């Protein structure tokens, strides 16, 4: 419900609500501003990919971004480059955590799990609406372009460990 309330109205294509959701008075304000279709609870449950759906589904138009949308003036950009992430929940959590850390965007390699997987979307907890993102056919090219524009690149891997607080990061 929270994610639905955060999406920009002009990006909403269709809205479907369960009968029980439509009957709850607490949802009147949420539904007042959109056209929606009421669906029998039994059918709604089949439409949803979760075991206990909240009663509202929306088809939302994707927003297209470029790397330029992520490059901030004054060398303030912090782009999260993700390569080959396979778990949808992990991808969504990384995007959500990145937003909390102040990233200006996310660039993913094309072998990363689908950003629009329902589990990924849910685990972003709305960050997908606020953080510019793109999937790149030229992942290395994006990293090089970011460096060319003054960005600093830090990498992680599973074979070593270091406390992120020990890094000297630019202000």
Predicted features along the sequence, with ranges:
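Post-transcriptional modification and biogenesis factors for structured RNAs
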Residues: 1-171
């Amino acid at each position: 419900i929270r994610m639905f309330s955060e999406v920009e109205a002009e990006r909403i294509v269709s809205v479907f609500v369960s009968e029980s959701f439509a009957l709850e008075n607490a949802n009147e304000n949420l539904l007042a501003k959109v056209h929606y279709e009421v669906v029998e609870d039994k059918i709604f449950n089949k439409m949803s990919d979760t075991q206990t759906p909240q009663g509202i589904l929306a088809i939302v138009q994707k927003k297209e971004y470029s790397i330029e949308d992520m490059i901030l003036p004054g060398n303030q950009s912090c782009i999260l480059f993700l390569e080959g992430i396979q778990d949808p929940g992990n991808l969504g959590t990384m995007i959500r955590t990145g937003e909390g850390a102040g990233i200006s965007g996310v660039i993913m390699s094309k072998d990363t799990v689908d950003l629009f997987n329902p589990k990924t979307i849910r685990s972003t907890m709305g960050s997908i609406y606020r953080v510019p993102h793109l999937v790149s056919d030229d992942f290395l090219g994006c990293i090089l372009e970011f460096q060319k524009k003054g960005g600093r690149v830090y990498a992680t891997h599973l074979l070593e460990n270091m406390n992120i607080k020990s890094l000297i990061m630019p202000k």
